[in-house]
Amino acid sequence: MRVRVLFFGMLKDLAGRPSDTLELPDGASVRDVLQHYAIETPPFKESLAMLAVAVNQEYAGAETALKSGDEVALLPPVSGGSGRPVGRDAASGLPSGRASGLRASIVRDPIDTTLILANIKRGDDGAAVVFEGVVRNQTQGRRTLYLDYEAYEEMARQQMEALAEQALKEFQIRDVALVHRLGRLEIGEVSVLIVVASAHRAAGFDACRWLIDTLKRTVPIWKKEYFEDGAVWAAGEPFPAEIRP
């Protein structure tokens, strides 16, 4: 059988390509894909303990069986945080009118925090908590010129949407919006925005903190940091054990 393999972040650099077509015997599993690349590309072996695997945009274990035509994504640890760009709403990170119920968006245009906050707030809210992740000008003493974000886009949007839904169930909040920007970002620009509306501030703060912490560990988005003396993919923590194959 034949499967399509996708590489992201540092794994894309190690492989020297963004994707591959891999021939496997019938009955093969995710483990067979990992073993193949550990042999073909030795540096992959050092990353196996930290990466996650998605099959058809869902996290998968090592024993997950594959079938012909599957899309297998090899995901290095994430380092941060699909909008449909139609008019100002989408460009600012909101699905148009929010009538579709979508609470998560991935965009390439600047994020308009004021507009998104205005769309979220309602008269019966007692608090609106806003978190902006901003591009800073240095990392561990190295001067940063700019950042470049990439994502496994559709899966990332789905994961962000799932986080929003989970937050609505687990915290006493009324509404939430998550937006992450991709592409080149300059110093001071907003890379990720979370807005939480609630009756009381404590629930809003708790939900916002949980959302950004979980997004940064589980949503497949990576950033490359460009310095005066070179560029590197930002190191992320290993995926949670329940996600890793």
Residue ranges and their predicted role:
Residues 60-61, 199-203:
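Glycine-/small-residue-rich active-site loops that bind phosphorylated ligands and cofactors
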Residues 29-32, 202-206:
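Short, conserved charged micro-motifs
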Residues 4-6, 14, 67, 71-77, ...:
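N-terminal, polar/charged subdomain of small-to-medium soluble alpha/beta proteins
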Residues 1-86, 96:
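Ubiquitin-like/PB1-type beta-grasp interaction modules and other compact soluble beta-rich domains
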